Amino acid sequence: MRRRCRTSELRASVGGNHPGAGQSNFAVVLTNGSRRTCWVRGFPGVAFVDGRGDAVTPDPERARGEEQPTVTLTPGASAWSAMTFANPAITGVTTVTPAALLITPPDETTSISVRWTGGEVSNTGKASVPQVSPFRAGDAP
């Protein structure tokens, strides 16, 4: 019987930036590291944090109006969510360089910490609050 994927069964990663039209675009990826098939549905929880684990930016928003498919993950398969925000170099807002991105799978309360290598992000929420999309099958477009 298929069940929802648990944090302990998943590995997390963040893809490289694919910038466009003043936006920074990253793929938040969850990969099934277990020996059983499971599924994810919905949005990731994400938080930019410093070296102590304290949040350094406003909470990202969920993209509205997007379908939330159930993504079946066989062992080794991945699902990805698009995380988009305005390029801080263009908006001129104050910034911070996070140490990590905490990724929480849908309907879970335990996060996976991934080292952040994507550079500066706005720490004010004034120009652009990051948005995340629902998970889709695959490891990114």
Feature-to-residue mapping (PLM):
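Low-complexity, acidic Ser/Thr/Pro/Gly-rich terminal tails and inter-domain linkers that flank the onset
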Residues: 1-20
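Short, solvent-exposed loop/turn segments enriched in Ser/Thr/Gly
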Residues: 21-27, 94-96
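Asparagine-centered strand-capping/turn motif at beta-strand->loop junctions
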Residues: 28-35
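Short acidic, flexible loop segments centered on an aromatic residue
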Residues: 40-54
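Short, surface-exposed linear segments at secondary-structure transitions and domain or protein termini
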Residues: 49-52, 66-71, 120-130
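Surface patches in mature domains of proteins
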Residues: 55-62
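Intrinsically disordered, low-complexity Pro/Gly/Ser/Thr-rich segments with frequent PxxP/GP/PP motifs
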Residues: 62-88
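Extracellularly exposed regions in secreted/surface proteins, prominently low-complexity, repeat-rich
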Residues: 80, 87-88, 93-141
